[in-house]
Amino acid sequence: MNLTQLICELTLPCADNGRDFTRTDRIHRIRDLLRSTPYTCLGEKPLVQVWQHSDFDPALPLVLVSSHIDSLYTNYHASCDDGILLGTFDNSVTNAVILSLILENSLPQQVLVAFTGDEEDESRGADQVIDILQNAPPNPIHPEMVVVLDITEESYDSHSFTFENLFRASKEAHSAQLRFEKKRDLAQFLRDLLAPSDPIIIKEGEPDESWQYDEHDLNCFAFCLPCKTITGDMHDEKGVHVKESSVHQYANTLAEVLALILGHPNMKPRGGPTPTVLP
């Protein structure tokens, strides 16, 4: 199954009431597809599932990828014509991207993947992710960076991805190996990862789940896929347009960014030297 087919297959009903999922078709399909992979469920709560690779080592630095699966549509559809996808893709398209990296074995083993609910309201799913990590046996798990996946109305005509909503952990944060003095230092860090290209960076974009992870004092940013709305509202059931070429570039860049973050010299096993403040 290629990425376009996976996007169409995952554009299924998935909704919640702020306490529990009330429509679960997409959740069940994701579970079905993950059965053939080396990933197991690290923890599950009413509004989240967190998945880990069988070789994940909690003693090593890790990155959390969070992709919300709740949506506001009543009816769902997805199609592709002449390289342009059309569908109710908030947020099935990024669900499919991260799942495709898992299925292709293109995701670093130190990446945890969370599929969350309630992003469209209070982001309680993000809070439940943190609860799972803090209570993980035998010791709490502290991500060095959180990467939130979502769609954006920015830069559809010119770019295949954007970095938005940059947040940095405070000096008092529990275990950040990557420390940034100011938000602009995190922005420069992201530019340096992909040099010499010049990515679009929007330090404060539309609210998304990254805002909630910031409440837990974590380094965080949103990695967004540009879309074009039909009616001016990405939640309208007419859907949005997404370029097929952009989706592939977005997926490739996500895999690259995750590997580069985990390979950064400051990322040391726990108990190592105090990390340097960047830049």
Where are the predicted features?
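C-terminal accessory domains and tails appended to enzymatic cores
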Residues: 176-180, 189-190, 196-235, 239, ...
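Hydrophobic/aromatic beta-strand patches that form the interior of the parallel beta-sheet core
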Residues: 63-65, 114, 145-147, 219-223
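Acidic/histidine-rich catalytic neighborhood of metal-dependent amide-processing enzymes
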Residues: 85-184, 191, 201-212
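A non-catalytic alpha/beta surface segment that caps or lines the substrate-entry region
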Residues: 6-58
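A short glycine/serine-rich beta->alpha loop
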Residues: 16-17, 81-89, 201, 241
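Short glycine-enriched loops at secondary-structure junctions
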Residues: 67-72, 149-153, 226-228
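Catalytic-core environment of secreted peptidases
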Residues: 50-93, 114
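His/Asp/Glu-rich mid-to-C-terminal helical/loop segments that flank catalytic regions of hydrolases
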Residues: 103, 228-279
